[in-house]
């Protein structure tokens, strides 16, 4: 792989997508491509498609990979001013993770809702990586950011949802979060209220779950010192997504 040392490498001025691949199919590929192009435009990288990037290139790349990798894998697409490349790895989320449910904590790092970078999936990803590592070192699954106003925004690698009286709630975009592909899917299938949620309000919710393109829908059994013993709504959302994802 020939990678040029452009501003993507030097300053994080690049965009990327991570896409679940199941049985050789990249899930929600068109949505990911659309978001990648938006980020490339925001960062003034130039159009990805103008450089020859296409769905056909993605499928050609996947066809060249080992079938064990593409049966339950992760496709990463990275775009910077002078680079556009694919990378493949296995998807490590397991049924055991879903059965147990995630344990998360509130991060001490604040999400900057005033930064435009927060709303795009860019190579400026240091806060997320460091806090995800901190979560793993602490023996938990995820850290959840609050913004400079103390409002819950998102996880290090996930969007977050809460359930109260069977209604689904999620932080509104202005709280400083990536508009996730699975977040968009959930909001297209269910009635979801976008709102402002503070950590001291978590006791009023009965369920919590997080989403991203690789895990899909993951129940959360504990966030900080708040436990969520119920997962009825989360399981409903996950069941519908799992039944539809191969057609998305």
Segments the model singles out, each with a brief description of its role:
Residues 1-60, 64, 80-248:
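Helix-start/capping segments and mature chain N-termini
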Residues 75-77:
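A conserved short beta-strand within the histidine kinase catalytic ATPase domain
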Residues 64-73:
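Short secondary-structure junctions
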